């Protein structure tokens, strides 16, 4: 399963042609559409194959590829996308070449997600996770449909039996949710959640450095501060329509 939230910079100004030309015939013929998300998946499969792992190999159908391999292929995918953008002549490509690459991939055993922006100064679209041992409904919100209510993550030990990943917190318990840092990977494997920095030209190791949220917001993306503000607002007014919308999303996630 593959997911993408964001967009590849200069997609229709030379990057798409370079990406499409770079993937093997096997992955080229697989793509049925023209979106950057579909072609990014083809590029991921091509990167996985070039690492020596056949995406259709029977030996991987039961145990998967391993989270380390998935992460390597994901990082290679991002590296290649950045390379395609650099390869487009400046007089052809868009003035703004920044990409928002929040990807997610799973082989049925491990999950690897990214929160990434190809910029040294901008914040990526937000990404959060919540982990614990049980996902419980605390009560029914007044006026909501039967079965809908306020949920929270509970933890009885260090294991992560349940891990939820979302672009914004799905509950009003802010302390249930951990922000994935900009330009990082989130890996879920065997009840363990790992976060690794994506160290490239756009990485900033300073914990005090504050990135700008303007770029992601102009692309219609939720940023970390926006998501935090939404949770705080909803927790003060449990009667808002936004609350019902959020609770509905929680039901889908729990189901």
Q: Which residue stretches match the model-derived regions?
A:
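Conserved short alpha-helical segments that host acidic/polar catalytic motifs at enzyme active sites
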Residues: 1-255
């Amino acid at each position: 399963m593959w997911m993408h939230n964001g967009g590849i910079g200069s997609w229709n100004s030379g990057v798409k042609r370079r990406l499409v030309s770079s993937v093997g015939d096997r992955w080229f013929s697989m793509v049925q559409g023209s979106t950057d998300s579909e072609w990014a998946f083809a590029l991921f499969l091509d990167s996985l194959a070039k690492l020596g792992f056949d995406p259709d190999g029977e030996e991987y159908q039961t145990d998967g590829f391993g989270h380390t391999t998935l992460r390597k292929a994901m990082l290679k995918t991002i590296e290649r996308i950045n390379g395609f953008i650099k390869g487009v002549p400046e007089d052809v490509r868009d003035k703004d070449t920044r990409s928002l690459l929040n990807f997610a991939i799973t082989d049925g055993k491990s999950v690897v997600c990214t929160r990434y922006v190809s910029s040294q100064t901008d914040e990526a679209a937000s990404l959060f996770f919540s982990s614990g041992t049980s996902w419980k409904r605390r009560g029914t919100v007044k006026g909501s449909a039967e079965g809908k209510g306020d949920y929270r993550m509970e933890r009885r030990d260090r294991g992560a039996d349940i891990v939820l990943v979302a672009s914004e917190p799905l509950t009003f318990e802010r302390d249930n949710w951990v922000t994935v840092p900009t330009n990082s990977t989130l890996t879920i494997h065997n009840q363990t959640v790992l976060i690794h920095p994506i160290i490239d030209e756009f990485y900033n190791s300073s914990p005090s450095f504050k990135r700008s949220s303007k770029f992601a917001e102009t692309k219609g993306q939720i940023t970390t501060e926006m998501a935090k503000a939404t949770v705080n607002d909803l927790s003060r007014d449990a009667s808002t329509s936004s609350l019902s919308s959020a609770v509905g999303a929680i039901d889908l996630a729990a189901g």
